[in-house]
Amino acid sequence: MSTRPRTPAPGTPAPGKLAIPELAGMKARRQPIVMVTAYDAPSGRLADEAGADLVLVGDSAAMTVLGHDSTVPATMDEMIVLTRAVTRGARRPLVIADMPFGSFQVSDTEALENAIRFVKESGADAVKLEGAGPTLTRVSSIVGAGIPVMGHVGLTPQSATMLGGFKAQGRSADKAVRLLADALALEAAGCFSIVLEAVPAPVAEEITRRLTVPTIGIGAGAGTDGQVLVWHDLLGLYQGSSPRFVKRYADLATTIRDAVSAYAADVRERRFPEDVHTYAIPEDELAAFRETVGAEIGRASCRERV
């Protein structure tokens, strides 16, 4: 009897799945890497069918899906449910789970335990951590256990308050040097890729040139090795304010609103459902049904009079 596991071990790609070493090859060939967020099975499947290389189950779900004002309230349990759904839909892309605030800040041990949960309970291929500094030992610990890690520097939403709000980072020489140092440190700690968020394009391009691992930009210009956008932003689903780096490729909020409004109008005017939306019953069976129901109603009326 075969003992081969149905689910590949961490770092071992499933058949047909993009392998992490291929990302380095894409960087070497200057082939842009496409990453997009997803939060459920349908969005994961559509991202896969559209040709995305990486799918990030972002803690941005706290805002786009769960209705919070920031990413901070996202919990491990919520992120695991969302990631599990995405992995059911996305087969070829690498699925990366965003470690939410509080899941890795306390200690290396807790960070590793939560990363293991993502792999075991949701089927994630990798995890993403924000920041450098104390995050470096967390990265080393997780990578040491065989779980791939994506880094994230620049604007890190989980610590936006400490950074002075949702603002671009690295806009002075000193801060740009710090960003480069953080990115290099994350690479040395074992990250297979690094997100650069809200970083001036020339700074992001220089960081990309100096790193051997791929960079994924969001608001970091066209000189990074790849790009990422939030699902709800690029589809025009998110109704809040969007950063300047967002490009909307559709206005699905309007499309959906119009569709639901049309449905509501049809229901109220009794235009829906039509005959094509209903199920038939043979005439003889309908007659028997009515006869039976009528007899039962008659017997009930007699009992009530008694």
Q: Locations of the language-model features?
A:
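Conserved small/polar residues in nucleotide/adenosyl-binding loops
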Residues: A300-V306
